[in-house]
């Protein structure tokens, strides 16, 4: 009887361990080769569907500052790499997790002489959508404008980026939104309040 109980207990424990391991792996954001995205590495962000545009980059919308976050027009463009900085890193702080607030920063200098962090900008009067720009948010959105999060899609390895910094401020009520494209005057800008844009992360 004790032998049967022991075997049954071992089987249950094995299933529990498998569940925990699978859940833990699912918490990590994966790059295009299935490896966890790490905060100290550089990555290109690009759409899953290549005819939607190329890699992410900084775009001059109207020859003025700040620069906007956008996409290269085609997959042939070099684009700019980014680094991810989690708001609340875990003990394994180098790994980026889904549904957690983080900062996204282009690893490049800006002609505007300012931070190259992604930031939630003002609502565009023509499209009614909130644009993603670069710079440090000191007041516009309660200092929460620099925090985004990577969320899963039904397809493994494909993600959306959202602005919804509820980890930074759990008691705040935000008008959350998902990043999508906005085509304007031959340029591709990134903005909220459209359909979700599936993205992947390609290590440099």
From Swiss-Prot:
Phenotype when changing residue 173 to E: Stronger interaction with SCP1
Site described as Important in determining the strength and specificity of the interaction with its subsrate, positions?
A: 173
Q: Which Gene3D superfamilies match?
A: 2.80.10.50
Q: How does it assemble?
A: Interacts with SCP1 and CP.
The protein's induction, as recorded, is: Accumulates in roots during colonization by arbuscular mycorrhizal (AM) fungi (e.g. Rhizophagus irregularis).
What PANTHER family does the annotation carry? KUNITZ TRYPSIN INHIBITOR 2, KUNITZ TYPE TRYPSIN INHIBITOR 104
Q: Which GO terms describe its cellular component?
A: apoplast; extracellular space
As for family, the record states: Belongs to the protease inhibitor I3 (leguminous Kunitz-type inhibitor) family.
Which species is this UniProt entry from?
Medicago truncatula (Barrel medic)
Q: Which GO terms describe its biological process?
A: arbuscular mycorrhizal association; response to symbiotic fungus
UniProt tissue specificity: Expressed at low levels in non-mycorrhizal roots.
Glycosylation sites noted in the Swiss-Prot or TrEMBL record: 62, 141
What are the annotated disulfide bridges?
Answer: 65-112, 164-176, 169-172
| Coiled-coil annotated residue ranges, if any | none
Endpoints of the signal sequence: 1-26
Subcellular location(s) of the protein: Secreted; Secreted, Extracellular space, Apoplast
The protein's predominant localisation is secreted
* Pfam families to which the protein is assigned, alphabetical: Kunitz_legume
- Which SUPFAM superfamilies did the record assign? STI-like
The UniProt entry, under InterPro entries, shows:
Kunitz_inhibitor_STI-like_sf, Prot_inh_Kunz-lg
Single annotated GO MF: serine-type endopeptidase inhibitor activity
What is the purpose of this protein? Protease inhibitor that, together with SCP1, controls mycorrhiza establishment and arbuscule development during root colonization by arbuscular mycorrhizal (AM) fungi (e.g. Rhizophagus irregularis), probably by degrading SCP1 in the apoplast of the periarbuscular region.
Which keywords, in A-to-Z order, does the entry hold?
A: Apoplast, Disulfide bond, Glycoprotein, Protease inhibitor, Secreted, Serine protease inhibitor, Signal
Q: What is this protein called?
A: Kunitz type trypsin inhibitor 106
């Amino acid at each position: 009887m004790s032998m049967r109980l022991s075997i049954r207990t071992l089987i249950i424990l094995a299933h529990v361990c498998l569940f925990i391991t699978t859940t833990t792996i699912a918490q990590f954001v994966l790059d295009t080769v299935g490896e966890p995205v790490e905060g100290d590495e550089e990555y290109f962000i690009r759409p899953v569907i290549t005819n939607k545009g190329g890699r992410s980059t900084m775009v001059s919308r109207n020859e003025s500052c700040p620069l906007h976050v956008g996409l290269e027009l085609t997959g042939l463009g070099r684009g700019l790499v980014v680094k991810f900085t989690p708001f609340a890193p875990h003990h394994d702080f180098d790994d980026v997790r889904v549904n957690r607030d983080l900062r996204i920063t282009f690893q490049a200098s800006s002609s505007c002489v300012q931070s190259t962090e992604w930031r939630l900008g003002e609502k565009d009067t023509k499209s009614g959508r909130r644009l993603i720009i670069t710079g440090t948010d000191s007041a516009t959105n309660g200092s929460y404008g620099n925090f985004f999060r990577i969320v899963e899609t039904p397809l493994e390895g494909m993600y959306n980026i959202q602005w919804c910094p509820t980890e930074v401020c759990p008691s705040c009520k935000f008008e959350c939104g998902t990043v999508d494209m906005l085509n304007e005057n031959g340029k591709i800008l990134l903005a909220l309040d459209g359909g979700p844009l599936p993205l992947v992360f390609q290590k440099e």
